Amino acid sequence: MFPRILVTISAFLLVQMSLAQPMVGYFLSPQSELSKGRAFKSIEETSEIFLKGLTITPTRMEKKFNEFGNITSSVTYNSAGGKTNEIYCEYVNGENLVRKQTRSFVNHRGWQEEEVFITWDDCYSIPQKIEVKKNGQIWQSAKFITDSILKFESAEVFNSKGDHVFTERFTYMEASNIIKVMVFRANGAFNGSSTYPINHKESFTFESVKQTLNPNGDVMIETLSHAVSGDQAYYYEYEYDSQGNWIEKNTFQVNLSRGNRVTKKKLENKTTRKITYH
């Protein structure tokens, strides 16, 4: 059984980043990975999970980036070398996402496809409309309302028939580099909320997760904001390349004592990366 706090952190992050997101999330979710040196050209990532009593085969992911550090493709493979997920992104001026295609293999259903199309204003400074298709059929679309300085105020979301189904309202927390998105049904009933970075190329963290960084600026300890001494946490150890980017990351379940002292380390995940640069 997973410790309660670890399950809570994992569930929280999955909710924040999952595809069941507000429409604005298709634009605000990070499409890049930050390099501490030169811009990434490609990353080949292998991940192994270690759980007592379970044998889980490693997975491999290959990512490619443009010269601005934005992902152009991401392909995930199972242990047999078969593709299980594909993501392809297209940009204007290298930075403005205009199309994102995701193909995922789902058991008993086969390949499922999602396409996102983003329409920008004439200066490519802010999106005006987002349309999402699932398996070739229009699923939802959204039109955005901005203020005088081009900050999102709200979005009106429509279903495949053109009916208004949701309204998304935005609150900015500049000091934390965060936008909080509150979603309401067409009748005004609250439906949920999500959090995104204002600038995904700068550091940010979710409100409910507390992080301690190592001297290289990577997360070393991660726990819930209200955690106390003795609670469970995640602890990370890294190896780095000459650019300052990690090439091996080990994730441990740990107990925290006073002063963030780590005890009872249990290896949960090991990820290695082969990186090339522009």
Residue ranges and their predicted role:
Residues 1-25:
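Bacterial Sec-dependent N-terminal signal peptides
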Residues 21-278:
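Buried hydrophobic residues that stabilize the cores of well-folded domains
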